[in-house]
Amino acid sequence: MILCSYWHVGLVLLLFSCCGLVLGSEHETRLVANLLENYNKVIRPVEHHTHFVDITVGLQLIQLINVDEVNQIVETNVRLRQQWIDVRLRWNPADYGGIKKIRLPSDDVWLPDLVLYNNADGDFAIVHMTKLLLDYTGKIMWTPPAIFKSYCEIIVTHFPFDQQNCTMKLGIWTYDGTKVSISPESDRPDLSTFMESGEWVMKDYRGWKHWVYYTCCPDTPYLDITYHFIMQRIPLYFVVNVIIPCLLFSFLTVLVFYLPTDSGEKMTLSISVLLSLTVFLLVIVELIPSTSSAVPLIGKYMLFTMIFVISSIIVTVVVINTHHRSPSTHTMPQWVRKIFINTIPNVMFFSTMKRASKEKQENKIFADDIDISDISGKQVTGEVIFQTPLIKNPDVKSAIEGVKYIAEHMKSDEESSNAAEEWKYVAMVIDHILLCVFMLICIIGTVSVFAGRLIELSQEG
């Protein structure tokens, strides 16, 4: 018996709930039918034709999809929050079961033809016709999503340490300011749901309302809302993948001058660095904006690195040529000896080349310094009279001539060897000078390319 009573109570509750749903659905159906009956969505929703429709526009930025530097297009995911009052869509909630808000298809009511003026590629107007929210006071809120591709003048002068000021210009396409007025919901777009980009960070963003008078209609204003977005690029990717490798190539080029010329690998290392740099530039060239409006910083640095490497090859050829010079082909000028052997090594703290002193060279035995007493076995004092029988001895005379020839030949070989060693020493001094000079050029060149822009960013930040 108790079980039966529970079943009855449940059945009664189910019937009452179904009746409520039917009545609620009936109220909403009747409300929508009454609102849209004789409704003309072409006519502006105003009580008098002299009145204007006041529309509040709010831009909600969801995502920065892509920045195309070459075509100067910025692709964004946005939501346009639009609010206005339609005087023909009002009702008394008491007459419709207390319903205060309903959702209607946006195709069934009047909509402002809000478009993106600086559209670059895609749809100017909103294409996703989502439902709108209607209040019993006639207030409409419509927040359709949109993918905008807006034109933005991309300035690549400071790439990859650049900032871009991009805009979105929104306005009513058909009506002038006397028919439809638009106002920004806030002086800043809504970034509460913005998804951070891995390449860009938003530094500032604002919106302004403009009254524009065109030449066709000088007395009638056309209204638009322009949103400005200042975006700063995150340069980490380009620093790690482009700038640091180029810097390493430059330092590797400097090491060419530290490599001894006798090793025979100077040109091999120089050409290898040049080929490696060329292949590297071919790989990363797609990362750099291919535009002729300006030369980006990273392009300047890559050009500097290429010139730096080629210059090192040219001067390496000069050093190798100097190293292999000989007295039979080149005579060392006095100014070269004075600068590169006597002056620069002392100034730059090089270890001077060990050469025989004049005293030692004078003490060496040559044909002109032969002691005749060593040959005759007698001590000879004073001048030697060469008409002695000793000199007239053919064997002794032949021996002296042979010793004299050998001594002169040895002297000539030693002078040639000393001259060749001097050329090698000059080449070594030039190598050390170029090592210091190219190291300074590498550091100063890198700093001069990037330092100015980095200082500007630090002051702005």
Curated annotation (Swiss-Prot):
Glycans are attached at N165. GO terms for molecular function: acetylcholine-gated monoatomic cation-selective channel activity; transmembrane signaling receptor activity. Residues 321-432 are cytoplasmic. The chain crosses the membrane at residues 235-259, 267-285, 301-320, 433-451. Residues 25-234 are extracellular. Residues 1-24 form the signal peptide. GO terms for cellular component: postsynaptic membrane. PROSITE patterns: NEUROTR_ION_CHANNEL (PS00236). It is found in: Postsynaptic cell membrane; Cell membrane. It catalyses: K(+)(in) = K(+)(out); Na(+)(in) = Na(+)(out). Keywords: Cell membrane, Disulfide bond, Glycoprotein, Ion channel, Ion transport, Ligand-gated ion channel, Membrane, Postsynaptic cell membrane, Receptor, Signal, Synapse, Transmembrane, Transmembrane helix, Transport. Gene3D superfamilies: Neurotransmitter-gated ion-channel ligand-binding domain, Neurotransmitter-gated ion-channel transmembrane domain. It is a multi-pass membrane protein. It comes from the Eukaryota. InterPro entries: Neur_chan_lig-bd, Neur_chan_lig-bd_sf, Neur_channel, Neuro-gated_channel_TM_sf, Neuro_actylchol_rec, Neurotrans-gated_channel_TM, Neurotransmitter_ion_chnl_CS, Nicotinic_acetylcholine_rcpt. Upon acetylcholine binding, the AChR responds by an extensive change in conformation that affects all subunits and leads to opening of an ion-conducting channel across the plasma membrane. Pentamer of two alpha chains, and one each of the beta, delta, and gamma chains. PANTHER family: NEUROTRANSMITTER GATED ION CHANNEL (PTHR18945). This is Acetylcholine receptor subunit alpha. It comes from Torpedo marmorata.
